[in-house]
């Protein structure tokens, strides 16, 4: 069996490689996908990809496995970054990492290797199970690290080639394995934030592409102007960090795109702006449309929290979702990801928040 392993330079993908080797497979080649935008934005921050590559080289040397670098910066910009910029300009809250997996790691990369390999291995925290020649995406053992949210838009064809060796492990167990076998990157910290930015701050990326435009910050309850901001595209509904005003905490509860106004509220009044009903479209089902929508739960952001909900099919590509509890940060552009027990069924894009 010929196996391709996607190495990032981090601990997770390195332990995934080790576990495949430990199973006795020998026909293995590693790939590092270069998608960072920091060549373009090098004046903003330091470039991590050389550091990543140093760790990739060290890990491959330890296990005597060949590796290759593939540059996907152009594809990434066209398929993921341009979408992110467009969503921000439209006042939405994008989820670029979902498309990173669908369109680049398991899209452009699969096209590049063109059926050369029987299996592609990564360090994602998720599980793929097979039944009756169909593939099912399941949550990882580690519910905190679980990445099924970001893998929710995979196709059956993509899943047929994938294996996630870390799906049955806790992060603490992965760290311990790295120490036990003395991996070169055993003490490296986990990466944070959006995958294509590296060490670039998100707001610097936004500023580079969309610029700045002064606008007012208004307290929702009083209508009083209590500050200014540099553009609505820097803010998302539910945001608390980065408002930088005294007498907090403050939360972003509404955006007026036409007037470039950010509305904020104190925590004690914030619940009045919470919503529970919204519409989603651009629906993707991993195993086709379910026969019923009973006992569904959804996530509206990466993390452990799931909501019980009711789903109502309005049209072929339109679903109304009603949560059992209100949420403070539902925003157009986010993705609602569907679950039944531990199975991830797919997801859809939020485009209208109702009540």
From Swiss-Prot:
Residue numbers annotated as active site: 100 (nucleophile), 195 (cysteine persulfide intermediate)
GO biological process, one term: tRNA modification
Keywords: ATP-binding, Cytoplasm, Disulfide bond, Nucleotide-binding, RNA-binding, Transferase, tRNA processing, tRNA-binding
Keyword hit for Transferase: yes
GO molecular function: ATP binding; tRNA binding; tRNA-uridine 2-sulfurtransferase activity
CDD domains: MnmA_TRMU-like
Site features described as Interaction with tRNA, chain residue numbers: 124, 334
Disulfide bonds: 100-195
Amino acids binding ATP: 6-13, 33, 123
Enzyme Commission number(s): 2.8.1.13
Catalytic activity: S-sulfanyl-L-cysteinyl-[protein] + uridine(34) in tRNA + AH2 + ATP = 2-thiouridine(34) in tRNA + L-cysteinyl-[protein] + A + AMP + diphosphate + H(+)
Record Pfam families: tRNA_Me_trans, tRNA_Me_trans_C, tRNA_Me_trans_M
Subcellular location field: Cytoplasm
GO cellular-component term (any): cytoplasm
Entry keyword Membrane: no
Residue span of region Interaction with tRNA: 145-147
Organism domain of life: Bacteria
NCBIfam families in UniProt: PRK00143.1, trmU
UniProt similarity note: Belongs to the MnmA/TRMU family.
Function comment: Catalyzes the 2-thiolation of uridine at the wobble position (U34) of tRNA, leading to the formation of s(2)U34.
Name recorded for this polypeptide: tRNA-specific 2-thiouridylase MnmA
